[in-house]
Amino acid sequence: MKDSERTKNWYSEVATTYATGYLALATSEQRKNWYSEVADAYNRARPRYPKELIDRAVEVAQLHKDATILEVGCGPGIATIPFARFGFSIVCLEPSQEACQLARQNCASYPSVEITNTTFEEWELEAEKFDAVLAATSFHWVAPEIGYLKAATALKDNGSLILLWNMTPQPPYEVYQALHEVYQTHAPSLARYEERGTQEEQLRRFGQTVIDSGRFKGLVSEQLACEVTYSIDDYLLLLSTLSPYIALDPQERNSLFEGLRAVLERNCTRSILTSYLSAFQIAQKI
């Protein structure tokens, strides 16, 4: 299979996972700026990674206090900050200029964090320099024929690839049922509910891809069931940062959100309790 076909198949699989076919068709430039218009919303609404999960990831990856980390797609620094608190030196790569600005603001108290506005694909490789390559809900955006080889090459001997994942927060099923008609009217492709088993299967597939790359071994996967409560405004803000919603026509998205808001205000109290899986997958360079 040609690299271009393999890349398209990879993005198609990711598109299936994230309920939008647009990712498979987007150009590299479009993927680079995918979150730019919602960078502030992403910073405000995306769930954080539990401290327990981060602490355990540091333990499994055996990161010492002087460890150097390369972070791929840091966004506004949601995962960067908890790792920076350990005192690690972190080089962060982020393709969105808007997200870079937020990351620099959020990480201003951590002088050991360096943020560069570039993609992992375009970054000039520094071989065998890093103790870990970190990607927090971002590695699926990297072209597969580049990502695993480049990550392995950047790592020192016995270095670790650390993939963090926050799956999409789901409302209670009865709330989903109340919203179903709105989705069927305005965005039928998004009218799905992710049960825990579905999210576990998505994580399993991502982990298997790491091993199938032939660049890493000894995959360790752990997960936590998490909850986060949103106001109606913040829940809609969260949805606005998810790829399936970003891919919608703006008018369709506005109509969808108006319908969702109306139902939520009619059926919910001021808050929505959501649940999701937060996980890490750590594998060692071969």
Predicted regions and their residues:
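A short SAM/SAH-binding and catalytic strip from SAM-dependent methyltransferases
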Residues: 131-145
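A short acidic, Gly/Pro-enriched loop at the edge of an enzyme's catalytic core
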Residues: 123-133
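N-terminal, positively charged/glycine-rich alpha-helical extensions of SAM-dependent methyltransferases
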Residues: 1-38
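A short glycine-rich, Lys/Arg-flanked "PGG" loop and its adjoining helix->strand segment in the class I
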Residues: 146-157
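Conserved Class I S-adenosyl-L-methionine
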Residues: 76, 200-286
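Class I SAM-dependent methyltransferase SAM/SAH-binding core
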Residues: 70, 76-123
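Conserved alpha-helix/loop element of class I SAM-dependent methyltransferases that forms part
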Residues: 47-67
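Conserved catalytic/acceptor-binding region of the Class I
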Residues: 156-226
